[in-house]
């Protein structure tokens, strides 16, 4: 089989304006970025009936460190839906440069299930992430300038919660001291960087309905606390208008295409632990108004991205998911059955019998939201027929549809069975979130911990209790909860693979994201600034005299 980049370069792309024309998007709402990429004005959304299409959410079982192929599945499913006569659009998050140059490489699908032009999407794209980083750091700069010139807002230097941001993996920037070198440079204090995808600005961009909503949300950001314990907002700094100006183009969804010319909206890229982990609401709603089926993807497993999509994104955007596709692999099932990473290519039926309990939990979790489930079993060359049969038979006995997905190797042809099974259940959804937003914070977390993470109880640290009291005092405790925890276990401990239960779920602290509109409950150590490995993917990336890029895949 050809490499991903060889497959991508052999594809025959349609001019992006043709893709837009086929979707009936008027030229007045388009801004072309070269021949194969364009931005669609967010104002076009006002012309659409967003109830037209059905929304398909692609999630996964608890992944291995390598991931299980959600993006490839999402792209393949959308192409297959088009192949069998339905208009479909896939909506995805934008790749971050940090992982591109780090361990992961490119993030535009793979094999015969890719979004293109791959090099452009992975490297800068249309500049959205750069705009987010610039907006984020303008706030940081104004905070320290405000303090330097009198600190009229009486900001407590020890309680500034707004870090700086950069779209790169750089562990040396996690914890730093700024403003060294004398009084002219400001007041020295501890600070740090997060990767841009973890910025609250990114979450706001993906949750905003329009520029005015974005401006209001930015103004509501709490950047820290005053010496008398009151929240200090961006609105008090007076720069929400400037931030909106920086993001005026970034708020517009990006239009590209798959390897088979299926339309793809790629817009925004918030983390699925510290934030909600799905592409922009504007892109999803626009796609719903232009197609029969919209395929969108949530980050990590169903305990993280899907739960947040159901409990937070859907109510916030008035979305009604029709189907959830849970991506599973034989290797991930064996991994949760106790098989080391180095041995995952070896047949092991006993490990599958044990590890499939993890998949069962994810199926049960999604069904608690009254959304029908289809399992997409991504097929790998090392999977044996006995292993595949065991997984299929076990899932079918649960009363859940399952499809062998071969979109990576066969494109849309490899996902037609999956598409048909999704359509079969698409009218059965009776979607409902699992908790009410106006419930107490502790109650919301206990529901998630016991129902989704399978804990027996919840423990709050002293720091968490203090932080929550501060949030309650500010009158912001009625916001929904985003739980930041490990993606490698349904529990709060990454070493607990499979189907752990009966444990105490620990909440270490709370973080207020009032601009985005949620409270983050932090469990365990959450890495917001990754580091590069000993041999990062950057050493594989190169460009020749003709401009051909190598090493992204």
UniProtKB/Swiss-Prot annotation:
UniProt catalytic activity: (6S)-5,6,7,8-tetrahydrofolate + formate + ATP = (6R)-10-formyltetrahydrofolate + ADP + phosphate
InterPro entries given in the database record: Formate_THF_ligase (IPR000559), Formate_THF_ligase_CS (IPR020628), P-loop_NTPase (IPR027417)
Pathway(s): One-carbon metabolism; tetrahydrofolate interconversion
Binding site for ATP: 64-71
Biological-process GO terms, alphabetical: tetrahydrofolate interconversion
Enzyme type, top EC level: ligase
Gene Ontology MF terms in the entry: ATP binding; formate-tetrahydrofolate ligase activity
Swiss-Prot/TrEMBL keywords: ATP-binding, Ligase, Nucleotide-binding, One-carbon metabolism
EC annotation from Swiss-Prot or TrEMBL: 6.3.4.3
Pfam family, one: FTHFS
Top-level taxon: Bacteria
Nucleotidyltransferase recorded as keyword: no
Family: Belongs to the formate--tetrahydrofolate ligase family.
Name of protein: Formate--tetrahydrofolate ligase
Organism placement in taxonomy: Bacteria, Thermotogati, Thermotogota, Thermotogae, Thermotogales
Gene: fhs
């Amino acid at each position: 089989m050809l490499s991903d980049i060889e497959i991508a370069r052999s594809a025959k792309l349609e001019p992006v304006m043709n893709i837009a024309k086929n979707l009936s998007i008027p030229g007045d709402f388009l801004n072309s970025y070269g021949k194969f990429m364009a931005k669609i004005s967010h104002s076009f959304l006002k012309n659409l009936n967003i109830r037209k299409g059905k929304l398909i959410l692609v999630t996964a079982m608890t992944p291995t460190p390598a991931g299980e192929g959600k993006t490839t599945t999402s792209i393949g499913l959308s192409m297959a839906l088009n192949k069998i006569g339905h208009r479909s659009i896939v909506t995805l998050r934008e790749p971050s440069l940090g992982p591109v140059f780090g361990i992961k490489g490119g993030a535009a699908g793979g094999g015969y299930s890719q979004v293109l032009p791959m090099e452009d999407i992975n490297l800068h794209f249309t500049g959205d992430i750069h705009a987010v980083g610039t907006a984020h750091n303008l706030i940081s700069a104004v905070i320290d300038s405000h303090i330097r010139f009198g600190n009229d807002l009486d900001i407590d230097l020890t309680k500034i919660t707004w870090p700086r941001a950069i779209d790169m993996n750089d562990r040396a920037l996690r914890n730093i001291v700024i403003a060294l070198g004398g009084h002219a440079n400001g007041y020295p204090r501890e600070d740090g960087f997060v990767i841009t995808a973890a910025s609250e600005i990114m979450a706001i961009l993906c949750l905003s309905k329009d520029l005015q909503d974005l401006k209001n949300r930015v103004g509501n950001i709490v950047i820290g606390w005053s010496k008398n314990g009151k929240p200090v907002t961006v609105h008090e700094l007076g720069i929400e208008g400037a931030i909106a100006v920086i993001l005026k183009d970034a708020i517009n969804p990006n239009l590209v295409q798959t390897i088979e010319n299926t339309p793809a909206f790629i817009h925004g890229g918030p983390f699925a632990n510290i934030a909600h982990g799905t592409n922009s609401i504007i892109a999803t709603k626009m796609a719903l108004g232009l197609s029969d089926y919209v395929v969108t993807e949530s980050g990590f497993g169903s305990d993280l991205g899907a739960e947040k999509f159901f409990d937070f994104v859907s109510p916030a955007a008035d979305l009604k998911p029709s189907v959830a596709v849970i991506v599973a692999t034989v290797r991930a099932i064996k991994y949760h059955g106790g098989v080391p990473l180095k041995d995952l290519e070896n047949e092991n039926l006993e490990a599958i019998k044990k590890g499939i309990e993890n998949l069962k939990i994810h199926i049960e979790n999604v069904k608690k939201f009254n959304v029908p489930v289809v399992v997409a079993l991504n097929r790998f060359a090392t999977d044996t027929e006995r292993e595949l049969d065991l997984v299929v038979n076990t899932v079918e006995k649960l009363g859940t549809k399952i499809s062998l997905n071969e979109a990576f190797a066969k494109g849309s042809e490899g996902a037609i069975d999956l598409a048909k099974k999704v359509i079969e259940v698409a009218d059965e959804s009776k979607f409902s979130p699992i908790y009410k937003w106006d419930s107490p914070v502790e109650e919301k977390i206990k529901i998630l911990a016991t129902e989704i993470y399978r804990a027996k109880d919840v423990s709050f640290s002293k720091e968490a209790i203090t932080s929550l009291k501060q949030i309650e005092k500010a009158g912001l405790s009625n916001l929904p909860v985003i739980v930041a925890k490990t993606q490698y276990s349904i529990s709060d401990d990454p070493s607990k693979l499979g189907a752990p239960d009966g444990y105490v779920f620990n909440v270490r602290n709370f973080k207020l994201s009032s601009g985005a509109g949620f409270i983050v409950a932090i469990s365990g150590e959450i890495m917001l600034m990754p580091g590069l490995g000993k041999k990062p993917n950057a050493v594989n990336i190169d460009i020749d005299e003709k401009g051909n890029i190598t090493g992204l895949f």
